[in-house]
């Protein structure tokens, strides 16, 4: 009986957990080490909190290493052996060529887009933000250039008309785990990306969530809300916009936008207040609603 395929797994957020779980559940693979970002302070108490990947790995009894800088600390770390594969899923650090050369077979990455589309840090959000009808996951052989490696496998899905980043996250994290297992279970057949068709998505900031009813259509704002809530969030002045639609909804307020479009806000949160429905906002903040409708 052949030995299981050895894996060193790099990942940090919830998106990476299904891929790690799938590898752990399949006896053809052996996850020998998990590398994750250091524990981070979270919430008002700033309590140091482990990543979802670390939590899962510890539950499975897998050794976890959390270097501040993988590239700087890699050479000094003692590895029991070189793995067959280095699997990277939303790790959160750019890895050096030294790290990429470490596995015997290949370094592979699960990326949440149909490469070469949406290379970069925020493919989930941008698929929704740009109104894409289709998205998916790519397993790529990693190279130094970001998300530019040969494609080892792809799987696509159609996006729902009301898709959100949260719903797409769950779909693609599951799909990515399935595709990862299928890809690593068979001989690799790399296909070079068409760099001429590459598109890119930047790391999001709070500035990406600013909206203006006088310069944006209802569809554009609605996509922002579905893409950017909860992070980095969507704001008009000091008011967080939490949920919207482009069709009339119960308990909503209607706001006119450019090109004679209307946005229906169903949930929002004034600064320092709890989230509320559109109709509750209308009753409690009539003056602010007037400014919102007037574009002030």
Stretch-by-stretch model annotation:
Residues 31, 63-64, 107, 135:
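Hydrophobic beta-strand scaffold residues
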């Amino acid at each position: 009986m052949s030995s299981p395929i050895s894996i060193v797994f790099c990942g940090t957020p919830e998106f990476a957990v299904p891929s790690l779980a799938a590898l752990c559940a399949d006896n053809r693979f052996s996850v020998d080490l998990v590398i994750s970002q250091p524990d981070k302070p979270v919430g008002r108490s700033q309590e140091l909190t482990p990543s979802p990947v670390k939590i899962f790995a510890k539950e499975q009894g897998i050794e976890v290493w959390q270097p501040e800088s993988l590239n700087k600390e890699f050479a000094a770390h003692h590895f029991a052996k070189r793995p067959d594969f280095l699997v990277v899923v939303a790790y959160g650090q750019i890895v050096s060529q030294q790290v990429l050369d470490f596995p015997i077979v290949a370094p592979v990455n699960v990326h949440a887009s149909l490469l070469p589309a949406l290379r970069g840090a925020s493919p989930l959000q941008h698929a929704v933000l740009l109104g894409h009808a289709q998205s998916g996951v790519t397993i790529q052989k990693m190279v130094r250039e970001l998300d530019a490696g040969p494609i080892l496998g792809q799987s696509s899905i159609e996006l729902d008309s009301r898709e959100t980043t949260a719903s797409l996250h769950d779909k693609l994290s599951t799909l990515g785990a399935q595709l990862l297992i299928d890809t690593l279970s068979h001989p690799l057949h790399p296909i070079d990306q068409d760099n001429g068709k590459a598109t890119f998505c930047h790391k999001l900031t709070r500035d990406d969530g600013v909206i203006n009813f006088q310069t944006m259509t209802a569809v554009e704002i609605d996509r922002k809300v579905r893409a950017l809530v909860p992070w980095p969030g969507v704001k008009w002045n000091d008011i967080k916009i939490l949920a919207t639609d482009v069709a009339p909804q119960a308990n909503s307020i209607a706001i006119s936008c450019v090109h004679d479009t209307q946005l229906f806000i169903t949930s929002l949160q004034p600064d320092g207040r709890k989230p509320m429905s559109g109709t509750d906002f209308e009753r409690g903040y009539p003056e602010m609603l007037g400014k919102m409708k007037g574009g002030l």
